[in-house]
Amino acid sequence: VQEVDDGLRTHLPAGAELEEIENAVRAAGSGASISYSDAGEIDWATMWPARVGVRRVGRIAVAPPWLAGEIADAEIPIVIEPATAFGTGEHETTRGILALMQDVIRVGDVVSDLGAGSAVLSIAAAKLGASRVAAVELDEQAIGNAEENIERNGVRDRVTMIHGDAALLLPLLAPVRVILANIISSVIVELAPAMRAALAPDGRVIVSGILVSERDALLAAIEPLGFELRAEIADGEWWSAELAPC
């Protein structure tokens, strides 16, 4: 799901029950409307090489397999097969979290990555020294690609892929020293109580997927729950932040 100026945009698999989805939106009573367009068949194998390149963020460098040789000199090289999962380092939100987490994650940390997608953030956390990383993903279609990326980067012993709802899983994963959440702002607000409850006393939450225009509203929503802003990055229209318990 992607937040756009006039609402939300998402992708649905072929054969999705569009009428049921439209009825559910109307039944919510929000006054929202819904429209569709056919994306057609996408040949991911030929699309990605033209769109995905090498991205360097501090000590971390991210590249697809066909460009892996170009990041051999990086302190922390990460090779990600794009497939259909979000998180190749191309987007500002991914780069924002990658930048912030380098000053936060310590050797031996327990980390939870909510909405793990391609598992790029989970892999980065492990390579930064985390001893245990729970990569939580609700989209079952993303799991296989994430598992392959975890294996490819040699962090299988520290990163566990978990399919499920972050709100239900966080209490089981607690206490967590660092929580990573690159998801839309409305979901971050929904998860904020569970994140605060699961966080270790000296823990940190690093969030992204938030528009700069949503910054103040998000902070106003989560500060009463016991969060304070420690660091932030704005990249174009996107905002990433490090939050601490207070």
Feature roles, as predicted:
Residues 33-35, 61, 132, 158-160, ...:
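Conserved beta-strand segments of alpha/beta enzyme cores
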Residues 9-11, 85, 180:
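Short aromatic/hydrophobic contact patches that present stacked aromatics
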Residues 1-72:
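N-terminal auxiliary segments of SAM/dcSAM-dependent transferases
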Residues 6-8, 76, 239-241:
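Short beta-strand micro-motifs in enzyme catalytic cores
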Residues 104, 138-246:
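S-adenosylmethionine
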Residues 84, 88-167, 175:
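Conserved SAM/SAH cofactor-binding pocket of Class I
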Residues 29-31, 57, 73, 106, ...:
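Short, well-ordered coil/turn elements that cap or connect secondary structure elements
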Residues 54, 58-92, 98:
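Proteins enriched for Cys/Gly/acidic motifs involved in redox and nucleic-acid/cofactor modification
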